[in-house]
């Protein structure tokens, strides 16, 4: 049986990357929430 997670960097960046997050209002919310929490990595 094939597993569901088949990692690839391109789709990963496209969906969860910093630039992608900054494109939308909600994405910017995500980044700011992670900044406020003090996350070491804000995005992928």
From Swiss-Prot:
GO terms for cellular component: ribonucleoprotein complex; ribosome. Keywords: Ribonucleoprotein, Ribosomal protein. It comes from the Bacteria. Residues 1-44 are annotated as: Disordered. GO terms for molecular function: structural constituent of ribosome. Pfam families: Ribosomal_L34. GO terms for biological process: translation. PANTHER family: LARGE RIBOSOMAL SUBUNIT PROTEIN BL34M, MITOCHONDRIAL RIBOSOMAL PROTEIN 34 FAMILY MEMBER. NCBIfam families: rpmH_bact (TIGR01030). Belongs to the bacterial ribosomal protein bL34 family. This is Large ribosomal subunit protein bL34.
């Amino acid at each position: 049986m094939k597993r569901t997670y088949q990692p690839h960097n391109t789709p990963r960046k496209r969906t969860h990357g910093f630039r992608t997050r900054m494109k939308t209002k909600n994405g910017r919310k995500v980044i700011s929430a992670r900044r406020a929490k003090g996350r070491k990595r804000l995005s992928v």
